[in-house]
Amino acid sequence: MRASPLAVPANAPSRKKRLELDDDLDTECPSQKQARSGPQPRLPSCPLTLNPPPAPVHAPDVTTPSRLGPYVLLEPEEGSRTYRALHCPTGTEYICKVYPACERLAVLEPYWRLPHHGHVARPAEVLAGTQLLYAFFLRPHGDMHSLVRRRRRLPEPEAAALFRQMAAALAHCHQHGLVLRDLKLRRFVFTDRERTKLVLENLEDACVLTGPDDSLWDKHACPAYVGPEILSSRASYSGKAADVWSLGVALFTMLAGHYPFQDSEPALLFGKIRRGAFALPEGLSAPARCLVRCLLRREPTERLTASGILLHPWLRENAIPAALPRSRHCEADQVVPEGPGLEEAEEEGERDMGLYG
């Protein structure tokens, strides 16, 4: 099997999915998940009234192990769409994402649009068959959600070094007409074992803009990261400003060890987000507090742009350390949770949008 050439058609349409917020706001796991120990409570349905999502196109199951050119597909990682893969000539491990061949344009369009950037993951190779499309990505060394869940609060120099990379990835996407919509800590993965270098992954669901107008109408978001304007009754909202809000939630979580807005009841959670009131943890520097407040503004037009974040004094003053220190802070109150039921997995064609992550 040969690698398929990635030439973007001149009249390629953009994909804008319409998805619902999931009823279960307490996990990110789809219905196809392993048995969990103990009862798993279900939360009441989301108070938002949204149009139902279109039925996804499911990729046929792949029998493993199977040979694809120089690769061998091993066991599935998350459901039936993501597999461990081994590049036989070099022994390098990859992650292989499998899609129906008919989704080739929608899956690859964000990567066609976006020039190379050091903090945005790209497929190392794409193989196209008659029924399936195989995209191979270098295997990461964990993600930011897992790091914060394990470490709790990160010291400011370390948080700044990591957040600078996250903001640079978002600024690059916005500069080239991509709105991420479902931005969260888990989408930033480490490329090194020391966990100092980050890349943004999973651009397949990004919205590709056709012009300078970034207005969106869908409700594609993770409840813990959703902006107040998405919860309002207004017809449209700025996709870029919504991404910046989500990045602000990520920064707060890195510095505090818990989300800025939390509640076990969806209606109360969304009420807190609409009000936009949150308490910053003690001990943060004035520049760090300033940056968080500049991102978590209720009014979208008052938030910093993604490129403006990189100019903020907190990121300019905190030089990247030679070796990132280990955090000794540990918060027991509403931390990014551990335990079963919180690992990310994907429904085929639709993300399960949980409270944690």
Curated annotation (Swiss-Prot):
Location(s), subcellular: Nucleus
GO cellular component terms attached to this protein's record: nucleoplasm; nucleus
Annotated domain remarks: The protein kinase domain is predicted to be catalytically inactive.
Functional note: Inactive protein kinase which acts as a regulator of the integrated stress response (ISR), a process for adaptation to various stress. Inhibits the transcriptional activity of DDIT3/CHOP and is involved in DDIT3/CHOP-dependent cell death during ER stress. May play a role in programmed neuronal cell death but does not appear to affect non-neuronal cells. Acts as a negative feedback regulator of the ATF4-dependent transcription during the ISR: while TRIB3 expression is promoted by ATF4, TRIB3 protein interacts with ATF4 and inhibits ATF4 transcription activity.
Subunit structure: Interacts with AKT1, AKT2, MAP2K1 and MAP2K7. Interacts with ATF4. Interacts with DDIT3/CHOP and inhibits its interaction with EP300/P300. Interacts with APOBEC3C. Interacts (via N-terminus) with APOBEC3A. Interacts with RELA.
Family, per entry: Belongs to the protein kinase superfamily. CAMK Ser/Thr protein kinase family. Tribbles subfamily.
Protein name: Tribbles homolog 3
Protein species of origin: Bos taurus
Organism lineage string: Eukaryota, Metazoa, Chordata, Craniata, Vertebrata
